[in-house]
């Protein structure tokens, strides 16, 4: 949380006007995400818990920041709907929470991905993994032919 606090302090200080953060709790509804080996915890539930706690922390410490959650309950949101929420609220910062799984049981800690405009292989791997949820959606025409399995 210290990292997020530092980012918010810098960004809010630089912005004289209102500032909006959209927090996206990844997965949800019929998309469970990763499931833990031992406790069988579902990623969607952990993501929602972390996202809600982060939103509360931001609101407590920075009441001038407008915090918007993409979901506050266990519902499935299409990727397009998540993007619509970000765009409709003119987000200055978009934070997407995921609690990824690892085959190595000794693995622990946090991952932070900041996807820029460079076409790095790691960015493509993350995008392909996270966009695979599109396969669960009924209407994929909103993506105008985007293939979640393609590296292009």
Residue ranges, per PLM feature:
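Positively charged n-region of N-terminal signal peptides that target proteins for export
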Residues: 1-6
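Catalytic-core regions of hydrolytic enzymes
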Residues: 19-149
């Amino acid at each position: 949380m210290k990292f997020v606090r530092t980012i918010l302090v810098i960004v809010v200080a630089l912005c004289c006007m209102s500032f909006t953060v959209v927090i996206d709790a990844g997965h949800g509804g019929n998309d469970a995400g990763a499931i833990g080996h031992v406790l069988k915890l579902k990623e969607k539930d952990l993501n929602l818990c972390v996202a809600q706690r982060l939103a509360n922390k931001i609101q407590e410490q920075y009441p001038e920041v407008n915090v918007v959650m993409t979901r506050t309950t266990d519902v499935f949101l299409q990727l397009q709907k998540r993007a619509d929420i970000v765009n409709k609220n003119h987000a200055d910062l978009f934070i997407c929470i995921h609690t990824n799984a690892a085959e190595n049981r000794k693995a622990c800690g946090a991952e932070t991905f900041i996807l820029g405009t460079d076409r790095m292989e790691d960015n493509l791997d993350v995008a392909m993994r996270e966009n695979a949820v599109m396969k669960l959606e009924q209407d994929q025409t909103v993506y105008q032919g985007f293939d979640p399995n393609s590296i292009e």
